[in-house]
Every structure is written in C-alpha cells, then in structure tokens.
C-alpha cells in the first residue's frame, strides 16, 4: 500500500498486524494453512491482513497462461498505486504488477531494484533487505 488506501481489501481478509519477516510470510503461504489462499497486504514493515480478495484484471492483453493470482495482482495495480509482488504457486517465479503492467520472471536482485525504483527508496538504505524463500522440502 502506498497513498491509495487498501482498507476495503484488507476487510476481505483476516487481520494479522505483524512485522514482516521471512518466517511470517513462509507460515502464511504454507500449503494447507488457514491463511494460504488470497493476498497479503503490507503497509510499511507490517503485514496488516492475509487471505484478502483482490479485483481481477479484465485486460485481454494478459497472457492466457496467467492464473487468478497474477490477474488479481494486475487488477489491484490497475485501480490503486500499490506495488504488487506475485509468486507463482506452480513455479515459484516472481512477478511485479504496478500501474497495470506486469513484469515477470524477476530474480531477487531485479525485484529489489524494481521495489526501490517504485517506492523511491535509494538502494543503499536497504542493503540488508533479503528476499525470502520457502524452506526446501528436501532438507530436514
């Protein structure tokens, strides 16, 4: 969330009000958990709600291979100034939706650079920002 409030969309989900950490995000998006489906809304450094419903884009120019998650990410970016990060459930690939445009298949450095550019934050201020990844199912 930036200047345009996402409060109406927050209300469609479950209040969380927790500091953004990799552990929290991993737990939210773990399969077969109550918070798994839907969007997470972040304000500043806090996860404010999870399992939120977002409006789907009706942009006919979007690839037919994109599913609901990507269409919702683009949809919310078409009607608000939010930066939307989408992680494919099938492939784990990262996309960013902003102002109705979708950038796909970003690596961690590209995502970090894109976030800083959109949010007008110099990269130097957030050198320790790390992109979270789910734990490997092969490791014990």
Question: Model-derived features: where do they sit?
Answer:
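Divalent-cation
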Residues: 1-140
């Amino acid at each position: 969330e930036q200047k345009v409030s996402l409060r109406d969309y927050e209300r469609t989900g479950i209040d969380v009000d927790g500091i953004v950490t990799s552990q929290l995000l991993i737990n939210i998006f773990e399969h077969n958990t109550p918070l798994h489906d839907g969007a997470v809304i972040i304000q500043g450094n806090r996860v404010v709600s999870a399992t939120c419903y977002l409006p789907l884009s009706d942009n006919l120019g979007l690839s037919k291979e994109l599913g609901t998650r990507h269409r919702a990410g683009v949809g919310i970016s078409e009607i608000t100034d939010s930066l939307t990060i989408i992680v494919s459930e099938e492939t784990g690939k990262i996309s960013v939706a902003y102002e109705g445009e979708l950038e796909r298949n970003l690596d961690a450095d590209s995502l970090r650079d894109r976030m800083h550019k959109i949010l007008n934050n110099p990269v130097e201020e957030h050198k320790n920002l790390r992109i979270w990844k789910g734990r490997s199912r092969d490791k014990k």
